[in-house]
Regions:
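Bacterial N-terminal signal peptides that target proteins for export
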Residues: 17-34
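N-terminal signal peptide c-region/cleavage motif recognized by signal peptidases
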Residues: 43-46
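N-terminal segment immediately downstream of the Sec signal-peptide cleavage site
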Residues: 52-97, 242-243
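Extracellular-facing segments of soluble proteins and assemblies that are Gly/Ser/Thr-biased and enriched
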Residues: 106-189
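A glycine-anchored, Pro-Gly-centered beta-turn/N-cap motif
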Residues: 128, 217-220, 224
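Aromatic sugar-binding surface patches on proteins
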Residues: 192-194, 198-210
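Short acidic/polar inter-strand loop motif in beta-rich domains
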Residues: 228-235
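C-terminal edge beta-strand
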Residues: 236-241
Length: 243
């Protein structure tokens, strides 16, 4: 349900979030100067933390590797759709599937299905741009003639009215203004073939919140995302070893 995509099955539009994819108190000293210095130190620390996060997070309107980020959301969902349900990275509870079918310079962190909080451990090659789903929804045409405009309206309604409490931290530092990281595909796209060679590729539209990150420095990092879809809390923690 959440940090991934919304598969068919539940909710007023027949969707379940996937999931890609189930964040001083100053002592009142006698010496006012000491309090001022402590306050200044806290302010500078907060400023440094914000600057550090801002240097990692890529704005949603920025082009990444010659593609708008809405196209990267399509690529993420097509990556997820290529797996059978029981082998999907979205169903992975440990991180064992984090490297499955990853290719290119953008590395997808799979969302979760919302059934329970998930913590995954994953080794990520150095130099990879990270694509992190927070929460998203997918509308599929099934075997019907696709009505892309109508499907896009339903997907947008799901995100606008059913999603709340967005949160993301990188190494304990909050990512601000997650609302600005909403991506919608608008046009229909092929979600891929999985059932049989004779299957017709399902057309789909998607809407949701995703965050693209600059390659992280080598070493351990923790990314945590949370959201709520209707009354369902969604929580995924990624413990990454960049090397």
């Amino acid at each position: 349900m959440a940090s991934g995509a919304v598969p068919a099955g539940r909710g007023r539009t027949g969707q379940n979030p996937v999931m890609p994819s189930r964040s001083n108190v100053l002592l009142r000293g006698v010496v006012s100067g000491a309090v001022f210095c402590a306050g200044l130190l806290v302010a500078l620390s907060a400023s440094a933390a914000d600057a550090s996060t801002a240097s990692i997070v890529i704005g949603a309107d920025e082009i990444v590797l010659d593609r708008p980020q809405s196209e990267w959301s399509q690529a993420y969902l097509q990556w997820i759709a290529a797996f059978a349900r029981d082998s999907s990275p979205v169903a992975d509870t440990s991180g064992a599937s984090c490297t499955a079918r990853q290719q290119g310079d953008v590395w997808f962190l799979a969302g979760s299905d919302g059934t329970a909080p998930v913590t995954r451990t994953c080794a990520v090659p150095a130099g990879k741009t990270l694509f992190v789903p927070v929460v998203s929804t997918v509308e599929r045409s099934g075997n019907r003639e696709p009505d892309c405009d109508s499907m896009a309206r339903i997907a947008a309604d799901n995100i606008t009215h059913r999603v709340s409490r967005l949160s993301m931290t990188i190494d304990g530092q909050a990512v601000d203004n997650l609302a600005s990281h909403r991506l919608a595909t608008h046009d229909c796209f092929a979600l891929g073939l999985r059932q049989s060679p004779r299957s017709v590729a399902k057309t789909a539209v998607a809407d949701g919140y995703y965050v693209m990150l600059q390659p992280l420095p080598a070493g351990p990092h923790t990314i945590a995302v949370e959201a709520r879809f209707d009354s369902t809390p969604l929580s995924t923690t990624y413990r990454l070893d960049v090397r």
